Structure formats: structure tokens, C-alpha cells
């Protein structure tokens, strides 16, 4: 007996040496195996010692989140929704906590080793129609559950990248609820999502849960054709123009089976005629005998190819809602730190922020704000081997109706960004005793004109990998200075709003008088836990601000002493 205990003790010691971290409850252990990375989040493989299952450990840096407006709100929205929503086709959140010492937010979620449905479909091109119908039924079950909440929950960013697969069982679950919203009014108003999957009414800022049905239709189109919707468009503005003009993606014409095409087109109908998730789940197409569909994927599985640029595979609950933006590991690209530039021109503020994604791509976000209260945010990719700053800027102006002076400003900012990016890369390589960039490399960067190998390659590179374009009013009473004022405070207050939003899900379901005692106790416990988490975060934020002020004062004093 004693020898057995000693043996188990040796195993325990070996296991403890293998893991990197343990959660406060002592139930979950994190390994150093990285499953995926986002702009401010890293997903690690972890293990649940109680149930004996592998899980995903989502680690978010608070300092990084604070630097990205709106992301804290999205993160807390996702945490609250996942805690409140329980369904077999919605990804599970097991546990979450704030680590004050390391200044991180941690979430333990289900692990899907097969990755997203998009990656899974790309890997397995020859898929029987039965499988696609099975995926569709599961997605619709998840959507019906979200939309049946009181008030309804709208995902707003449904796409194959945000649907995850268990390849061993064929199980499919909806994830990435960071952009989801609780519909407390008849229609929602904010414009947000991924352009290729956004319903026309989303741009009009008057929509309801049926926008998710439109996105589901685009998911079906991608599953059937193995092509990203609107891949014929070269930038987000062209997608916007087609969607708002009710022009369907060219890939829809590649769907040969009339019943499949009819089913997809039902999802893309105007909102007033669009069926609900429950109605679609009862559609005869999903009940058809799979044996009759042998030719459904014949053309797409053999000839179609994904035309999107290579991307990092986003694992479950990647809160970096770009969705399509690839963010590489700093270990692979040590020069990939974020660069931000600012210009004031024609009484407008231009902000360009981005980072290098890989050897040939940089991901950028351009924000243009004017005193009238209108703000435009455009996400795009710059392909270093073929794109030019002027060409990218002119494309934006052509579709977004900007002035010629704004073309110059945007092109100049992109030029400066690329120069700084290449300069940072040179420094990084030098520090690691790697070869420096040659003189010719710098000349190419200065000119920002690199001829593509052929016309087809140029066309391919110009298909910018764009995640979203937002148009929304902001408070601009004091001009440019007001644009940034109170942004952090708004993020924190929006967290409190999200708390109250989730409370209404329960409050509108049953009245206070109908609460059983055990439910009251559980709800009070949840309320106190999240209030404490908020206080912890607020304290961390205040500490970070004080540290920044102290560093600035110290730096200023040193400069005075030297002079």
C-alpha cells in the first residue's frame, strides 16, 4: 500500500513539473502548448483534473485590452452571455476569473481540437451532403436558442470562423459571442460584424435577430462552395456596395443543385420575408434523404479553392473579432508590435493602427473622425509584395467618397507605417544577430512600389482581408480632444450596462415574486461575484494609470537633470 502511494506521489510530482499554471480553485492546470493567438488573447491547452478532460485556457492581458477601445466591453459581454446561456450547440464557459498579480483575465472553455468549421471544411473538401445538413441543423438549433431568449440574443458575427467542430463526433457549436447583443428594443442600432456576412439592414442600423439568419445563409454558401462570400471584391467598400444593393455573391452561381440554392436564397431574403431559425430547421431541404444529393458538392469539392490569404487558425472563443485578421506569434515575428500613427487634416482626425501579420502581410485599422459626430473605421490588410499605399488609399476614396486631400493623407500614413514596420524588423533582426535588410530592401520600402509577378497575383493580393467597417456617432462637443475623452470610462460603464442587460434576461422571464429561494441565492451570488470582478478590474486600471504617470514624471525629471 505504501509503495503504491509512493508511486502515485512520483506521478503527481512529474505532472506538477509539466504544467505552467494552476487556476485559483486548483481544478484546472495550464500547459505551455499554444492553440491560438489573437490581438490581445492567447489560447492554451489545459486540463480539468476533476472531470479528466482537456479544455481551453483563454488568457487575456488587461493592459492590452485597455489599449483597444470597446474590447473590454466585448470581452465582458461574452463572459456574461456564456455564463447565462446553456445549450448543446453553444460553446461552454466553465470558469473565469481575474488574476490581479499577473493582470490577466482568464476563461476556461470547451476545447475543439478540430478548430473552426471554416478550417475543417477547407481541410476536408469531399464532404457528403448529409454532413453539411447535420452541421446546418445544429447551427440552427443554437441560433433558435439564442433568439428564443427573453429578450432575444443576436450573435451579429456568425460565420464559419466562429463555429467550432469536434471532428470525432461531428458536433458543432457556436462561439465568439463577443459581438453579441441582448435585444431590449424592437430593433438594434449599432453597425458591427464581418462585411461578407452582414445583412443589408445591419448597415441601416435598424435590425433584429434575423440578421443572424442572413449570416447563416452565407455560412451555408461557404460550406457548399468552399469559397468565402464576395471573394470577387477587392476591398470592404465594394462588399458594402454590393450588399446594400442586394447583389448576391458570385459564388452563389456555382451552386448547381436548385434545392440547395433555394434554401440559401431563403436565408438571404429581405428581413420582412426572411424565415426564423425554427422555420428553417423544419425546411424540407434539411429533411431530404441524403442519398438523393450525391451531386450536391460535386463541382465545388473538386474545383473550388479558398481564395482568402493564409490565416492563423482561431481556436474557440477568440475574442479578437477580426475574425479574419491573422495575428502571428511574437516568437515567430518579434517585430510584430503594434504601430499607431495620427494626423489632423481638413478638420478631421486620422488614426492608423496595425501590426505585421506574417512575412508578406500587415493588418491595419484606419479611423477617420470629423467634428460632426461621424466616425468611420476600416479594417484592411496590406500585402507587402504587391500593394502600394496610393493604390489602397485610392480604392478607399473611390468607394467611400473621400476628398483628394484625404487620399494623400491616408497614403502618406500607410507609407510611414510600412517604413516604421520595416525599420522595426531591421532592428529586431540585428538584435538577434540575424542578417540586416539590404539597401535595396529600404529603397523598395521608400518607393512603396513593388511590381507583382503577374496580373493574377496582383489581383489576389489586393483582396484585402477586412473584418469590419463601422459608422457611428460620437460625442464631439470639443472637437478632436473630445474624440478620445472618456473612452476608458465608457468601456467600464458599458461593463455595468452588460451586467444589467443580462439581469433582464432573468427579470423578464419570471417576476421577482416567482423566484424560488435557491434561485435567488444563486443569482445573488452571481451578482456579487461579478461586482467584485469589476472592482478588481477598476483597481487594476487605476494602478496602471498611476504607474504610467509615475514613469512619465520620472522620465521628465531625468530629462531636466541632463539639461
From Swiss-Prot:
Listed A to Z, the keywords are: ATP-binding, Kinase, Nucleotide-binding, Nucleus, Phosphoprotein, Serine/threonine-protein kinase, Transferase
Q: Which domain of life is it from?
A: Eukaryota
SMART domains xrefs: S_TKc
CDD domains recorded: STKc_WNK
- Describe how it is modified after translation: Autophosphorylated.
* Reactions catalysed, as given in the entry: L-seryl-[protein] + ATP = O-phospho-L-seryl-[protein] + ADP + H(+); L-threonyl-[protein] + ATP = O-phospho-L-threonyl-[protein] + ADP + H(+)
**Active-site residues (renumbered):** 176
Entry GO CC: nucleus
Give the record's GO biological process terms. photoperiodism, flowering; positive regulation of flower development; protein autophosphorylation; protein phosphorylation; regulation of flower development; vegetative to reproductive phase transition of meristem
Q: Which GO terms describe its molecular function?
A: ATP binding; identical protein binding; protein kinase activity; protein serine kinase activity; protein serine/threonine kinase activity
Q: Which Enzyme Commission number(s) are listed?
A: 2.7.11.1
Modified-residue entries (Phosphoserine), positions: 509
Alphabetical list of Pfam families matching this protein: Pkinase
List the biased-composition ranges (Polar residues): 426-436
Q: Which residues form the Protein kinase domain?
A: 29-286
Q: Where in the cell is it found?
A: Nucleus
Please give the coiled-coil regions recorded for this protein.
none
What this chain does, per the record?
A: Regulates flowering time by modulating the photoperiod pathway. Phosphorylates the vacuolar ATPase subunit C (VATC) and RGS1. Regulates EDM2 that, in turn, modulates development processes.
| Name by which UniProt lists this protein | Serine/threonine-protein kinase WNK8
What is the originating organism of this protein? Arabidopsis thaliana (Mouse-ear cress)
Amino acid at each position: 500500500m505504501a509503495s503504491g502511494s509512493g508511486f502515485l506521489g512520483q506521478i503527481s510530482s512529474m505532472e506538477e513539473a509539466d504544467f505552467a499554471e494552476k487556476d485559483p480553485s486548483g481544478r484546472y492546470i495550464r500547459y505551455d502548448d499554444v492553440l491560438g493567438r489573437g490581438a490581445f488573447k492567447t489560447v492554451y491547452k489545459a486540463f480539468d483534473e476533476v472531470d479528466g478532460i482537456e479544455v481551453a485556457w483563454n488568457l487575456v492581458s488587461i493592459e492590452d485590452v485597455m489599449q483597444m477601445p470597446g474590447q473590454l466591453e466585448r470581452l465582458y459581454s461574452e463572459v456574461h452571455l456564456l455564463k447565462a446561456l446553456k445549450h448543446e450547440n453553444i460553446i461552454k464557459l466553465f470558469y473565469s476569473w481575474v488574476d490581479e498579480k499577473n493582470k490577466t483575465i482568464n476563461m476556461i472553455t470547451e476545447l475543439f481540437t478540430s478548430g473552426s468549421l471554416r478550417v475543417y471544411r477547407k481541410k476536408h473538401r469531399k464532404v457528403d451532403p448529409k454532413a453539411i445538413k447535420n452541421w446546418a441543423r445544429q447551427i440552427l438549433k443554437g441560433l433558435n436558442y439564442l433568439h428564443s431568449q427573453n429578450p432575444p440574443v443576436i450573435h451579429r458575427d456568425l460565420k464559419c470562423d466562429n463555429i467550432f467542430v469536434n471532428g470525432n463526433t461531428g458536433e458543432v457549436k457556436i462561439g465568439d459571442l463577443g459581438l453579441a447583443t441582448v435585444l431590449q428594443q424592437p430593433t438594434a442600432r449599432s453597425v458591427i460584424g464581418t462585411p461578407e456576412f452582414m445583412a443589408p439592414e445591419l448597415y441601416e442600423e435598424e435590425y433584429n435577430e434575423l440578421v443572424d439568419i442572413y449570416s447563416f445563409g452565407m455560412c451555408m454558401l461557404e460550406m457548399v462552395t468552399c469559397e468565402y462570400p464576395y471573394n470577387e471584391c477587392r476591398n470592404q467598400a465594394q462588399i458594402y456596395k454590393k450588399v446594400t444593393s442586394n447583389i448576391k455573391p458570385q459564388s452563389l452561381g456555382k451552386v448547381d443543385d436548385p434545392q440547395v440554392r433555394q434554401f440559401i436564397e431563403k436565408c438571404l431574403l429581405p428581413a420582412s420575408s426572411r424565415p426564423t431559425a425554427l422555420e428553417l430547421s423544419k425546411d424540407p431541404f434539411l429533411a431530404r434523404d441524403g442519398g438523393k444529393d450525391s451531386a450536391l458538392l460535386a463541382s465545388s469539392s473538386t474545383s473550388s479553392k479558398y481564395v482568402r490569404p493564409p490565416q492563423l487558425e482561431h481556436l474557440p472563443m477568440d475574442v479578437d473579432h477580426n475574425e479574419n485578421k491573422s495575428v502571428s506569434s511574437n516568437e515567430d515575428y518579434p517585430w510584430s508590435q503594434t504601430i499607431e500613427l495620427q494626423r489632423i487634416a481638413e478638420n478631421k482626425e486620422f488614426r492608423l493602427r496595425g501590426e505585421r501579420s506574417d512575412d508578406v502581410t500587415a493588418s491595419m485599422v484606419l479611423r477617420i473622425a470629423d467634428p460632426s459626430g461621424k466616425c468611420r473605421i476600416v479594417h484592411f490588410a496590406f500585402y507587402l509584395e504587391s500593394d502600394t499605399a496610393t493604390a489602397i488609399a485610392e480604392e478607399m476614396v473611390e468607394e467611400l467618397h473621400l476628398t483628394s486631400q484625404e487620399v494623400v493623407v491616408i497614403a502618406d500614413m500607410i507609407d510611414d507605417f510600412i517604413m516604421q514596420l520595416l525599420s522595426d524588423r531591421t532592428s529586431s533582426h540585428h538584435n538577434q544577430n540575424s542578417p540586416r535588410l539590404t539597401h535595396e530592401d529600404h529603397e523598395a520600402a521608400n518607393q512603396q512600389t513593388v511590381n507583382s509577378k503577374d496580373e493574377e497575383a496582383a489581383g489576389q493580393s489586393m483582396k484585402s482581408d477586412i473584418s469590419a467597417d463601422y459608422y457611428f456617432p460620437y460625442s464631439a462637443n470639443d472637437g478632436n480632444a473630445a474624440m478620445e475623452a472618456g473612452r476608458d470610462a465608457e468601456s467600464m460603464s458599458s461593463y455595468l450596462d452588460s451586467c444589467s442587460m443580462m439581469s433582464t434576461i432573468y427579470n423578464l422571464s419570471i417576476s421577482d415574486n416567482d423566484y424560488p429561494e435557491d434561485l435567488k441565492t444563486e443569482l445573488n451570488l452571481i451578482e456579487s461575484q461579478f461586482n467584485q470582478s469589476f472592482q478588481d478590474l477598476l483597481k487594476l486600471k487605476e494602478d496602471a494609470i498611476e504607474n504610467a504617470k509615475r514613469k512619465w514624471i520620472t522620465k521628465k525629471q531625468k530629462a531636466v537633470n541632463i539639461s
